[in-house]
């Protein structure tokens, strides 16, 4: 498990090529309100052959709750804008796929994409 505190700039966290059973969990810790910086998770090598599958729960700071899902075939970026808090788990399912689950609390919805947002 990796904890991330307040940071001084946007951060990119690059996951290695997926492998069955390889697991990473990332959570924020001690953020002050909305951190003011974005966090991007990406898969090393990326492209459409390595991707995320699954979804996360978005807890809007305006008290709305929604699900944010991958397209299940090509998204290799997870973009989290100005998080208040997050807890994300990635589990390698094969040599090309990470399953993703967790939640993000923010005023801005996170997004999965094929390129950095």
What is the predicted function of each stretch?
Residues 1-64, 93-117:
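Exposed extracellular interaction/assembly regions and N-terminal maturation sites
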Residues 28, 81-85:
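Sequence/structural signature of small/polar-enriched beta-strand/turn repeats
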Residues 66-77:
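A conserved acidic, glycine/proline-rich C-terminal tail/linker
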Residues 84-92:
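Extracellular disulfide-bonded cysteine-rich modules/repeats
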């Amino acid at each position: 498990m990796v904890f991330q505190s307040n940071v001084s700039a946007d951060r990119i966290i690059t996951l290695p090529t997926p492998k069955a059973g390889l697991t990473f969990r990332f959570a924020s810790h001690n953020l002050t309100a909305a951190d003011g910086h974005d966090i991007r998770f990406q898969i090393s090598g990326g492209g459409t052959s390595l991707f995320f599958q699954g979804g996360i729960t978005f807890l809007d700071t305006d008290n709305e709750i929604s699900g944010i899902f991958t397209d299940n075939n090509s998204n290799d970026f997870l973009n989290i804008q100005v998080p208040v808090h997050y807890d994300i788990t990635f589990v390698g399912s094969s040599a090309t796929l990470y399953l993703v689950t967790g939640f993000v609390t923010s005023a801005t919805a996170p997004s999965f994409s094929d390129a950095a947002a």
